[in-house]
């Protein structure tokens, strides 16, 4: 006998609330995706190929990297492995959210919002769970993930079909577009930041700084993740040890 489908708890956030809460992400995604569409066509990809990247890969800054590598003649495997190394942090997003979610999850809905779990969507979901985890719902998550994905695809369509070189005379604007995603991600993280996490954040920053100074950006990402996670584990064990005595 099949288990009953989990129902949203009374007072939980709705799909439309998720769409509404995605507005800051949508506003930042459209211009960056627009720049990606322009850049991809400038590198020789067709408008349809550019849109395909955004629909299927949906990897933000990694899309700029993979299109540049493919245009330069790199093999598909090398480009794919490079992007996987850059985005390895996404492996931790699901477990991190799951540890805070108190509701039962429905596999079909989870698969939908998991596809759209970008840095910014993850940060927004974390902030929601930190403020009030009882209001979090999969319908809300689908709303924010779907709206964000749609805005990314929409921005790519506009950029890819508007013609190459539209921002060529405005380098400052093009540089600012590339900074919008990191700035948005940091704003969400600061909104959910708690003082007790200071040590973990410091360790992650030190690890990332050492990685980027001594090696490369992918190594810096891995080093930051490892240092932050190890510090969190040590801190949790140290704080929990007295209770076991």
From Swiss-Prot:
Q: Which residues lie on this side of the membrane: Periplasmic?
A: 46-63, 131-140, 194-205
InterPro entries (UniProt xref) = Brnchd-chn_aa_trnsp_permease
Phylogenetic classification of the source organism: Bacteria, Pseudomonadati, Pseudomonadota, Gammaproteobacteria, Enterobacterales
S-S pairs: none
What is the topology of this protein in the membrane according to its UniProt annotation?
A: Multi-pass membrane protein
List the stretches on the Cytoplasmic face of the membrane: 1-24, 85-109, 162-172, 227-245
Keyword list, A-Z? Cell inner membrane, Cell membrane, Membrane, Transmembrane, Transmembrane helix, Transport
User: Is the keyword RNA-binding in the record?
Assistant: no
Q: What is this protein called?
A: Inner membrane protein YgaZ
Instruction: Give GO BP annotations, semicolon-separated.
Output: L-valine transmembrane transport
PANTHER family assigned to the protein according to its UniProt record, in alphabetical order:
INNER MEMBRANE PROTEIN YGAZ (PTHR34979:SF1)
Any single GO CC term annotated in Swiss-Prot or TrEMBL for this entry: plasma membrane
């Amino acid at each position: 006998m099949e288990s009953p489908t989990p129902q949203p708890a009374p007072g939980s956030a709705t799909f439309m609330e998720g769409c509404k809460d995605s507005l800051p992400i949508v506003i930042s995604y459209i211009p960056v995706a627009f720049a990606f569409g322009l850049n991809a066509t400038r590198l020789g990809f067709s408008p349809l190929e550019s849109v395909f990247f955004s629909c299927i890969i949906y990897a933000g800054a990694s899309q700029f990297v993979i299109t540049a590598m493919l245009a330069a003649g790199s093999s598909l495997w090398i480009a794919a492995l490079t992007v996987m190394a850059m985005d390895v942090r996404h492996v931790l997003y699901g477990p991190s959210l799951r540890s805070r979610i108190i509701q039962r999850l429905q596999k079909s809905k989870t698969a939908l919002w998991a596809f759209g779990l970008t840095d910014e969507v993850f940060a927004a979901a974390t902030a929601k769970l930190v403020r009030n985890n009882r209001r979090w719902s999969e319908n809300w998550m689908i709303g924010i993930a779907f709206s964000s994905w749609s805005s990314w695809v929409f921005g790519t369509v506009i950029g890819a079909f508007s013609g190459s070189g539209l921002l060529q005379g405005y380098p400052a604007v093009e540089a600012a577009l590339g900074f919008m995603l990191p700035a948005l991600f940091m704003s969400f993280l600061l909104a959910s930041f708690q003082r007790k996490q200071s040590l973990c954040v410091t360790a992650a920053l030190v690890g990332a700084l050492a990685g980027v100074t001594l090696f490369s950006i992918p190594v810096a990402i891995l080093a930051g993740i490892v240092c932050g996670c190890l510090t969190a584990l040590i801190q949790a064990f140290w704080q929990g040890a007295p209770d076991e005595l």
